[in-house]
Amino acid sequence: MSVTSGRSKSLALVLLAATQFVVVLDAAIVNVALPSIGKALDFSRDDLSWVVNAYTLVFGGFLLLGGRLADLFGRRRMFMGGLVLFSLASLLGGLAQSSTWLIAARAAQGLGAAIVSPAALSLVMTTFAEGAERNRALGVWGAVAGSGGAAGVLLGGVLTQYLGWEWVLFVNVPIGLAAAALAPRLLIESREQDATRAFDLAGAFTVTGGLALLVYALVDANRVGWGSTETIVRLAIAAVLLGSFVVIETRAKRPLVPFSIFRLRTLRGANAVGLLIGMALFSMFFFISLYLQEVLGYSALKAGLAYLPLALTIIVSAGAASALVTRIGFKPTLIAGMVLIAVALVWFAQVSAGGTYLGDVLGPSLVVAVGLGFAFVPVTIAATTGVPAEESGLASGLINTAQQVGGALGLAILATVASGRTDKVISSGQHNPAVALTEGFQSAFLVGAGFAAVGAILAAVLISSRDSREHALAAQRGDEAAEAPSMAA
């Protein structure tokens, strides 16, 4: 079922995109507030990272389950329930009086976000017809998703400096509750037509536990060591759980994840590229923030403002990407985006300890923003092309999970690369910490560029050129059909 009024569709898209913006923003907004949070709640240095990790861990672990629940029990229903949970968790987090309290609230936020995000994307898919109309909608979606991380750093700096760290959490409450209240008016309920209340509990337990443990192992590997007993045991248990999930799903009468969806070649390729996008880009924001604050000496607010050109460029490039997908197809657009990301990260690798924002950061920020817009929009379209409406939540959960796991894996690898290079420079006799840190960042950016280059190759090899061409032709026909009545008038 879909909304037929153009105005209703536009309002629905605004609601869904704004909600996704908040979800993405929340993964980054606390970063610049961490020093203030640490002082206020007496966090240890190791525990402070869990303000971020608790959200990332639960979000990444539950995305696939959240998407499938939306298909089975109603996309609007799960969207609203996730928003209420997310908002209440944000309120509790802002009221936190201890480190344990805040970490628990952040985990609950992650759970709410894991329900909201795939439900919102699947509602976009069921509201907008495949083709030019959906491409435009996903252009808006890509713009807000891509700019959310940069906006989170900016907004986090402003709120922390002028209102206090609590407001990086309180800001979600009115937005989330307002969105939940508007949902019944603007969104039409939809779910799998033959869905029953029978639920694959074993599949849900194994895939959620496996993904959560995998993300946990990755985000904590840099602290405890890749070869440590803790990391090896966590990865082994995650592998056992995910392997068990595959066995369970092949035998279940009503599997949580019907593996028939993986027969779609383009979907498989898009998820592989989505993993590489996460590996290349999520850590980029982390290292740029460190460079701005620890090498260039920027305040949290100034570092946040430095992201403004990047965020604005993403919005423009995502809109351009949706039009380009309609004209030439999602495959060439995605390849171009991945190449631009690789070029930008190689450019970032030229930063110096005596650098400046204009000379070292602004140029590659604009290039990576164009690449990000050109990558996010087509990879989302490719990951959902040809997917039956009743499995749209599952497809949404898959691409979101690929990007989140990729982000955790990329950050774990690149943080290890950066710290290893920094330690080597210091041990060689370099006494200037800014020089040692910068050389570590340079190495991380180069490896990230390699991830993006591999993503471009995978897009060229794994994504169907025929699907891309057919999607573009169908979108063009849809545009022509939409223009015909207005020309006749």
Describe each region flagged by the PLM:
Residues 1-185, 319-321, 328, 332-334, ...:
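Transmembrane-helix bundle of Major Facilitator Superfamily
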Residues 1-8, 193-196, 462-489:
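Intrinsic disorder in cytosolic terminal tails and internal cytosolic loops
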Residues 13-58, 164, 202, 227-237, ...:
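Transmembrane core module of solute transporters
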Residues 21, 57, 91-92, 107, ...:
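Hydrophobic residues within the alpha-helical transmembrane core of Major Facilitator Superfamily
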Residues 23, 52-55, 59, 86, ...:
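Structural signature of transmembrane alpha-helices in multi-pass secondary transporters
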Residues 35, 67-68, 156-157, 215, ...:
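Small-residue-mediated transmembrane helix hinge/kink sites in multi-pass secondary transporters
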Residues 74-83, 97-101, 116-120, 129-140, ...:
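C-terminal module of multi-pass small-molecule transporters
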Residues 121, 173-192, 208-220, 237-252, ...:
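C-terminal membrane-cytosol helix-exit motif in multi-pass small-molecule transporters
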